[in-house]
From Swiss-Prot:
Protein origin, superkingdom: Bacteria
Pfam short name (any one): HGTP_anticodon
Keyword presence, Ribonucleoprotein: no
Top enzyme class: ligase
Catalytic activity, reaction form: tRNA(His) + L-histidine + ATP = L-histidyl-tRNA(His) + AMP + diphosphate + H(+)
Cross-referenced CDD domains: HisRS-like_core (cd00773), HisRS_anticodon (cd00859)
GO molecular function: ATP binding; histidine-tRNA ligase activity
Full protein name: Histidine--tRNA ligase
UniProt xrefs under InterPro entries: aa-tRNA-synth_II (IPR006195), aa-tRNA-synth_II/BPL/LPL (IPR045864), Anticodon-bd (IPR004154), Anticodon-bd_dom_sf (IPR036621), His-tRNA-ligase (IPR015807), HisRS-like_core (IPR041715), HisRS/HisZ (IPR004516), HisRS_anticodon (IPR033656)
Subcellular location: Cytoplasm
Amino acid sequence: MTNSGEKKFQPLHAPKGIPDYVPPQSSEFLAVRTAFLDAAHNAGYEHIELPVFEDTSLFARGVGESTDVVSKEMYTFADRGGRSVTLRPEGTAGVMRAVIQHNLDRGQLPAKLAYHGPFFRYERPQAGRFRQLQQVGVEAIGVDDPALDAEVIALADRCFRSIGLDGFRLELTSLGDSTDRPAYRAKLQEFLATLPLDEETQRRAELNPLRVLDDKRPQMQEMLADAPLMKDHLSDSSREHFETVTGLLEDMGVEYTINPRMVRGLDYYTKTCFEFVHDGLGAQSGIGGGGRYDGLMAQLGGQDLSGIGFGLGVDRALLALEAEGKTASTGRRVDVFGIPMGDAAKRHMAALINELRAAGVAADMAYGNRGLKGAMKAANRAHAQLAVVIGDQELEAGTVAVKDLQLGEQHDVAVADLVTHIRRQLA
């Protein structure tokens, strides 16, 4: 309590592990997300908007109960009706649910969908790892064709290059299919039985031994050095599929390395699996990834159709750009900045700014009765190309002063001709 008897409140902060994006970084965030989505839309992917929470059973069935995501990291709670719901930890399961519910799998195939938004995982916050992560993702559903795998991977590569990122690398592997997995699973469990595993790791080995390979602890990686590899247990069809994918990537000029030990953290992946990594991010080096998920739709109650997709981290991409000493190109915030000198001028300026906006010109104006010098500084901070000034002299003459802030040139323009003049200068 304060001396006056009023309660003293603690400062409010965002929840732990959840970043705010405020200007100017928010402009970079928007630039990265927009660049990713533009690349997806240019490749024929249509936008899909999904709820941020779903029935918990969707993720338990779709992502896999043995995964860390489901067993440890989900934000799950009961709503007022007693139903168990979960803030979405990833995007693919929700997209597949929507495809089944709205019969998108019964139209033109492949169904090519793009999405963006926040996803939630209860992880230990650290550099590059947040509890609310921002992603852009795509899913291509309904066609089992290695050319589609190559398209999706090349699209992800193009997304990162579109923001000026170049210090990343692409890692690929094949996880085989339902005919390859049983023999490999048995071989891997046989190997794991010889290791001194802790109780939690033993549980994983019984439920899904591939999850053990995803253990990043140094002592576990050392013990797993001689573990059998999936690449040595691929069927002829899985091997041919993977070789076709890599050949197509080479034709497209997409560089890659094969990582036979890659295991992504979700159970639904089959055949092609990939990850983009950036060494400038330290331990949290993954900036995006994905893979094929044949069988997931049937597992969720739909048709037995294949699919492939990716999720790209907007947060991680921003950190990777920072590690390279770069920023995302945000463009000019406004084209025109209005500077009224006096109350009468302010009324006229407000009307002119509204007219410019209606004509599609990005425009803002100075508020608060600041002087000309301060208003010009505000125009420069807004990265405006043109400043429009109205004072007593301009009011009397029915004109405005238009100044090019890059060239330093200034012209008097009749109010009636302002929109046409501005458009001509911005063209």
